[in-house]
């Protein structure tokens, strides 16, 4: 199998296949990937600044882009959180970085996930966006297991311009996403 950048694959193979299957009249009606958002919620980050810094470095290695620290919008006494405390990290990938991350996710990361049987096809939100979670950052090739102090999961949201879930599912399947049957 020869390596073809995903952007080229989208232009040359996926667009024509989508036009044929869904009967689009115009090439611009074909759904495309808009962005990928990686979110990492860090519970104890509000009490320990080092935890935020460590996970920010890991997320920067994974995404190839510096993450933004997300802060609490409201105070919640049961969770011991005050308004403005850091509670997580997020990265929004677009363009070349998005396609590079997607390639790495499909070909390197998902095959390394323990007991992986395919992605849940129910992760669509009704508007053509797909969300799923990973339980540990160790499945990424940039993270070495020796240097990880605390295993941390993350949420990944793939935002498309698709109008329906069926269009988005077909788009992601053509990109090579392994959905459960």
UniProtKB/Swiss-Prot annotation:
It comes from the Bacteria. PROSITE patterns: RIBOSOMAL_L5. It holds the Pfam family Ribosomal_L5_C. Keywords: Ribonucleoprotein, Ribosomal protein, RNA-binding, rRNA-binding, tRNA-binding. One of its GO terms (cellular component) is ribosome. GO terms for molecular function: rRNA binding; structural constituent of ribosome; tRNA binding. One of its GO terms (biological process) is translation. The keyword Chaperone does not apply. Belongs to the universal ribosomal protein uL5 family. Part of the 50S ribosomal subunit; part of the 5S rRNA/L5/L18/L25 subcomplex. Contacts the 5S rRNA and the P site tRNA. Forms a bridge to the 30S subunit in the 70S ribosome. This is Large ribosomal subunit protein uL5.
